[in-house]
Amino acid sequence: MNNQRKKTGRPSFNMLKRARNRVSTGSQLAKRFSKGLLSGQGPMKLVMAFIAFLRFLAIPPTAGILARWSSFKKNGAIKVLRGFKKEISSMLNIMNRRKRSVTMLLMLLPTALAFHLTTRGGEPTLIVSKQERGKSLLFKTSAGVNMCTLIAMDLGELCEDTMTYKCPRITERQPDDVDCWCNATDTWVTYGTCSQTGEHRRDKRSVALAPHVGLGLETRTETWMSSEGAWKQIQKVETWALRHPGFTVIGLFLAHAIGTSITQKGIIFILLMLVTPSMAMRCVGIGNRDFVEGLSGATWVDVVLEHGSCVTTMAKNKPTLDIELLKTEVTNPAVLRKLCIEAKISNTTTDSRCPTQGEATLVEEQDANFVCRRTFVDRGWGNGCGLFGKGSFLTCAKFKCVTKLEGKIVQYENLKYSVIVTVHTGDQHQVGNETTEHGTIATITPQAPTSEIQLTDYGALTLDCSPRTGLDFNRVVLLTMKKKSWLVHKQWFLDLPLPWTSGASTSQETWNRQDLLVTFKTAHAKKQEVVVLGSQEGAMHTALTGATEIQTSGTTTIFAGHLKCRLKMDKLTLKGMSYVMCTGSFKLEKEVAETQHGTVLVQVKYEGTDAPCKIPFSSQDEKGVTQNGRLITANPIVIDKEKPVNIEAEPPFGESYIVVGSGEKALKLSWFKKGSSIGKMFEATARGARRMAILGDTAWDFGSIGGVFTSVGKLIHQIFGTAYGILFSGVSWTMKIGIGILLTWLGLNSRSTSLSMTCIAVGMVTLYLGVMVQADSGCVINWKGKELKCG
């Protein structure tokens, strides 16, 4: 027997209300349905249709709908929306097939014609603005009302940078690889691509420019982006500080008084020290300095002047002269070629054809100001073609250069040289000033190579110069970019991958290779974007590393060069030759300062009463014997005993005494000069070899009185150079040196006199031609850096 209790069944009516449950009415179902939709409940397709309904009516969705929208999976939602799109397209086609009345068209056209309608080659053209994106553009044609749809993503503000292409006619197929289509006839569309601020689209990529490193010119001028200038300034600061300790202490005191912290004091002191080297003596403050000493009775001296160096000439009974090449100017150089480093494009137009319909054509292709590119693209039903295949495609864009640089040819007849000549007078103001105030400037041109300048109290000096720069201008181009200029290799300049035009001045410039600054994007069925690269100025600055930088002043360019001059000193006289020797005592005004040329500067003040007079000056050893020192300042004299006198001299190597005055009242200064005579000889030889590498054949003319010994090297090169080059053309430099040493050794050890002399002569000539520098190649020994450089 089953004693299990049965479950109580649900009553068929409500015991409290005493009434049966009823079926919901229609209004209750509608209320429940709408409430569920507003909260985002229901099937996906139904909810998305309701969301579209709200969007059409511009009704903001509820929080529940937004939450449900966020929960939809991407693939499923896209599939539903594509179904909506297909249904709407079908509805549009049905509506387009209906016959509309004239009244209906007149009502629709004003709302659709928010764009500008024109024609291109007899075909309709729409000029649309940014607001027309995604809208239906309606206009009347001979085939009926044409409705075009434009969904271009690059649609921007109207400007000169426009995009023009043809919208194909697509009726029953889904558009493929197009962002504009029409339903009645093919239509051209034009729109701007600028941003709201009017800026054009640019590509950030830079052109790959080959660096100029390794193609630089052998001059003493600093190269672009090198550290030479900084090191030279530091060396000048060090030399000036050691020479002027009093001013250095004053600068330190000023920095301590002005600055509030250690960092500020240090910065102020460094800035003061960087400025002070501008107060230096001409030639004394220049690192590259050459001394030329003429023989007794000399009436002329040959010198070679170059930028960044100074020449000091000395001759018996003649004043000591400091000569420096201030600048080399070139006026109105001819323009060889112009390069474009920044451009802009406009009026981009594209034409495309279906397969088997021939080549695409554009009128712009015949215009030299347009850059064009042809290609082939895939065409088919989805972009207005009845056949599938490759169709012809052509895009053109108008090219305009915004920033350009010029390459100019320098001609010898357009050169002008400025040479400054300063006399060593011992004036204290002359020592403390590097300006041209105390010197006389001569101007040399190829048309007037001779100049006579008057030196106050010292007569006249005639400069007979040969305007030979030492640079082969057939291989050099003067590159000018904005306010900067460089001397560059001509072939490097011509090989730069940048748009170029000829140097001839014309009203309309025609650029070649415009495509080097233009990027054609991926070609679509009816459209291709074209963008221009950004400014290449930064890339050019990087590529110019190692080039010789040139200063420009207006239309005149100042650059590195060389000048060979003959100084005719027959009209020069030495001031104070009739004065007697000073008998009084001298007082040292400043500590003896050593220059970077091995000379010393002595500043003394005369305490006697017999001025004007000549200053006795000599260099002696500890026993009082006069040594072979050299007095750079010729015939130092005292004019006014109240003014100090500066004397430059070259003491001998080792320990010596600088004696100023005579007798027991003489001022005796102990001095020690580092180095040796043999080392100086080798260093001078190496310096001459470097000058030869820089100046070429001009360097061999450096000397005085046209001496034979200075031309021996040139003579050997001219006689034996050609034969030597033919015999040893395939032999390495080390092998040439080895052969020369071997022949010399055989000559020294040979018992036969004739054979010995022959071997020694041939060995020495071979060794000389192998070591010394010719006009086109050679080797230089750097004794200070302990290295050998060949080139």
UniProtKB/Swiss-Prot annotation:
Disulfide bonds join C283-C310, C340-C401, C354-C385, C372-C396, C465-C565, C582-C613, C779-C790. Keywords: Capsid protein, Clathrin-mediated endocytosis of virus by host, Cleavage on pair of basic residues, Disulfide bond, Fusion of virus membrane with host endosomal membrane, Fusion of virus membrane with host membrane, Glycoprotein, Host cytoplasm, Host endoplasmic reticulum, Host membrane, Host nucleus, Host-virus interaction, Inhibition of host innate immune response by virus, Membrane, Secreted, Suppressor of RNA silencing, Transmembrane, Transmembrane helix, Viral attachment to host cell, Viral envelope protein, Viral immunoevasion, Viral nucleoprotein, Viral penetration into host cytoplasm, Virion, Virus endocytosis by host, Virus entry into host cell, Zinc. GO terms for molecular function: lipid binding; protein dimerization activity; structural molecule activity. Residues 37-72 are annotated as: Hydrophobic. Glycans are attached at N183, N347, N433. It holds the Pfam family Flavi_E_stem. Residues 101-114 form a propeptide. Residues 1-101, 261, 747-752 are cytoplasmic. The record marks R100, S101, A114, F115, R205, S206, A280, M281, A775, D776 as: Cleavage. Residues 378-391 are annotated as: Fusion peptide. InterPro entries: Env_glycoprot_M_flavivir, Env_glycoprot_M_sf_flavivir, Flav_gly_cen_dom_subdom1, Flavi_capsidC, Flavi_capsidC_sf, Flavi_E_Ig-like, Flavi_E_Stem/Anchor_dom, Flavi_E_Stem/Anchor_dom_sf. The chain crosses the membrane at residues 102-119, 243-260, 262-280, 726-746, 753-775. It comes from the Viruses. One of its GO terms (cellular component) is host cell perinuclear region of cytoplasm. One of its GO terms (biological process) is virion attachment to host cell. Residues 1-15 are annotated as: Interaction with host EXOC1. The transmembrane domains of the small envelope protein M and envelope protein E contain an endoplasmic reticulum retention signal. This is Genome polyprotein. The lineage of its organism: Viruses, Riboviria, Orthornavirae, Kitrinoviricota, Flasuviricetes.
